[in-house]
Curated annotation (Swiss-Prot):
Keywords: Hydrolase, Metal-binding, Pyrimidine biosynthesis, Zinc. Homodimer. This is Dihydroorotase. The active site is at 251. Pathway: Pyrimidine metabolism; UMP biosynthesis via de novo pathway; (S)-dihydroorotate from bicarbonate: step 3/3. Substrate binds at residues 19-21, 45, 140, 223, 255, 267. Binds 2 Zn(2+) ions per subunit. The keyword Metal-binding applies. Belongs to the metallo-dependent hydrolases superfamily. DHOase family. Class II DHOase subfamily. It comes from Escherichia coli O6:K15:H31 (strain 536 / UPEC). One of its GO terms (cellular component) is cytosol.
Amino acid sequence: MTAPSQVLKIRRPDDWHLHLRDGDMLKTVVPYTSEIYGRAIVMPNLAPPVTTVEAAVAYRQRILDAVPAGHDFTPLMTCYLTDSLDPNELERGFNEGVFTAAKLYPANATTNSSHGVTSVDAIMPILERMEKIGMPLLVHGEVTHADIDIFDREARFIESVMEPLRQRLTALKVVFEHITTKDAADYVRDGNERLAATITPQHLMFNRNHMLVGGVRPHLYCLPILKRNIHQQALRELVASGFNRVFLGTDSAPHARHRKESSCGCAGCFNAPTALGSYATVFEEMNALQHFEAFCSVNGPQFYGLPVNDTFIELVREEQQVAESIALTDDTLVPFLAGETVRWSVKQ
């Protein structure tokens, strides 16, 4: 990576956690990712979810159809795990290069997760098959029991689900997605080479005070929810350390404005347009720009056993204002940091 005073040149990054939705929303949001990233792990939580090879092939084609000419972008598809999923279907998709990984959503943990897994025991034959064939498991790491406080769901998941699972299936490759707590940062750092994590820009930049003090900011509301400052600091320190099993995963999750600015608003930040510059700002603030390229472009491919991208992009350090909104067919999208002045942006 070369870093003259105002330009960062890095190998083209990948996004290891992305929601593209479907239909008109998909057509609107895909270009914001495809112009910057070489690849992205695409989440399968559509309605209905992506649970078959055929559904994944069709969804992949809809994504590719939305990629503008001149963008070199490869969507990496995932399978949505359910209690009733056939392990043979999962293995077929993996062997045919359709499924890159499989996603475990605890039932009702987040958007469109009502079909999710009721317990790890219910899908143990599937997980055993994944361990056998070397297929990565992507985990939304929260318990969803009604009696557990929303701010404690990730920490409880580690002790009650994640650690027992990894003790039982010691060769299974696991990505602990969008980690938000010191508990998770410590757990991944202290784990072995088969455990990795992604972190979003919002969890590095903000904590729950930013979302709740002085008024509720619905466009910072996502799941897992922003935590207190000590957790934010632990995440920042983890990425700034150069730890090589944590990598870029935006969890960009678009919802129309009326679904966010509501009496019962949806969870998710549409950060695809601003995420890379946001990460750069955090690394700069932590005096860790020497580790920025690895986080964005190297650590993820290494964990997945994929080649790094062979093209490069540049970020420029000059103040720019983020758009207030982005047009949808019959509504608008509010991007992460809408209307704010940002320090780093991708050079056009």
